[in-house]
């Protein structure tokens, strides 16, 4: 009889096991506060399976192939979010199940609409700019008159030549670099005009002899170690590099600059794949992350700005008042976003980029 009751108990418990609630999250490396995941699991009973990627190409390839198994993903507005929206790879977000949506900054959400019309598929997670990480002391030692607040540090050959010995690094990202070069030349960052692109290629080729490295995430370590003195990279990467340099106490002083000529704004968004196996849990996760105290904890952890103004009350003062993380309005007026790039334009830019990297 006891065996019978035991078997019945196991049978009754089986559905509970089968119905365990989970959410599969796919995000950048080191891009969330572990406390947020812990609290979400405790408060909702939903288990988080968390995977990471190191490139947007990896994320996009998995989603376009279908059946990725992920419920929440974090595509950057351009170029990834716009392409995923166009290909139908993302599910519309049910805002009725995301009450925290009302706390998002409407001005910032408006900027994402060129990638996601109507903000149907993505909510801003974190944002920042593409600018310059600099080591002022090493730059001044080589070029005392070099403007530390200008893209001239990279794009003006006579200046780049002088600071070459301390190392110049730029992003290995044709869209980002070409858009910034267009802006530097006074053209539209989205221009596909042949004449504009020819001028960009001429500019890039003029500085090619002075570029030491093309890298993305590697700029953090290069800056922190003092292996490069100028790096075109993401704002948060420089903030992280500065923190590492300070911990190492080797005399490396770093600063992030959003140059006066203008810097590109980027937005990472929370989205749900159209074939997500747990869409309800995904909505619950997004709603939780966008709560002011939770997103503030994430900002404090990873040192990137968020789009929830009410979170300011919970952000560490040194982060909230760091112009490299939360730029003042006077700088924001010169910021720009890039729009979707056609397949033909992408191919043309890729060919130009290959010639630039090869130096011919």
Residue ranges and their predicted role:
Residues 69-73, 91-136:
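A structural signal for short loop-to-beta-strand junctions that line the ligand-binding cleft
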Residues 268, 273-333:
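Mature extracytoplasmic/periplasmic domains
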Residues 19-84:
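Early extracytoplasmic/lumenal segment of secretory-pathway proteins
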Residues 91-102, 152, 248-264, 273-276:
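Short beta-strand->loop
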Residues 81-89, 116-147, 176-185, 265-271:
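Periplasmic solute-binding protein
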Residues 2-14:
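Bacterial N-terminal signal peptides
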Residues 221, 329-360:
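Conserved C-terminal helix/tail region of periplasmic/extracytoplasmic solute-binding proteins
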Residues 166-181, 185-255:
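Ligand-binding pocket segment of bilobal, Venus flytrap-like solute-binding proteins
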């Amino acid at each position: 009889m006891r065996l019978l009751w035991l078997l019945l108990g196991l049978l009754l418990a089986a559905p509970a096991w089968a119905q365990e609630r989970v959410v599969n999250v796919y995000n950048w490396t080191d891009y969330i506060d572990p406390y947020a995941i812990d609290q979400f699991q405790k408060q909702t009973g939903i288990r988080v399976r968390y995977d990471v990627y190191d490139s947007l190409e990896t994320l996009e390839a998995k989603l376009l192939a279908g059946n990725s198994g992920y419920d929440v993903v974090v595509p950057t507005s351009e170029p990834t979010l716009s392409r995923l929206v166009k290909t139908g790879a993302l599910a519309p977000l049910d805002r009725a199940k995301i009450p925290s949506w009302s706390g998002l900054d409407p001005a910032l959400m408006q900027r994402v609409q060129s990638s996601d019309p109507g903000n149907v598929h993505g909510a801003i997670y974190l944002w920042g700019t593409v600018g310059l990480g600099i080591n002022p002391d090493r730059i001044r030692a080589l070029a005392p008159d070099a403007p530390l607040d200008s893209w001239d540090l990279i794009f003006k050959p006579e200046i780049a030549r002088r600071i070459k010995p301390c190392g110049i690094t730029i992003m290995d990202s044709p869209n980002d670099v070409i858009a910034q070069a267009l802006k530097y030349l006074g053209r539209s960052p989205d221009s596909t005009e042949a004449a504009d692109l020819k001028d960009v290629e001429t500019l890039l080729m003029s500085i090619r002899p002075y570029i030491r490295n093309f890298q993305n995430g590697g700029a953090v370590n290069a800056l922190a170690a003092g292996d490069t003195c100028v790096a075109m990279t993401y704002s948060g990467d420089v903030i992280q590099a500065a923190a590492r340099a300070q911990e190492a106490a080797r005399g490396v002083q770093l600063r992030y600059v959003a140059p006066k000529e203008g810097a590109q704004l980027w937005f990472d968004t929370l989205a749900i794949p159209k074939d997500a196996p747990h869409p309800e849990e995904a909505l619950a996760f997004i709603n939780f992350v966008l709560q002011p105290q939770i997103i503030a904890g994430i900002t404090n952890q990873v040192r990137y700005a968020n789009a929830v103004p009410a979170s300011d009350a919970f952000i560490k003062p040194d982060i909230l008042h760091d112009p490299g993380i939360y730029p003042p309005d006077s700088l924001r007026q010169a910021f720009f976003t890039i729009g979707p790039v056609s397949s033909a334009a992408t191919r043309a830019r890729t060919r130009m980029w290959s010639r630039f990297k090869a130096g011919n």
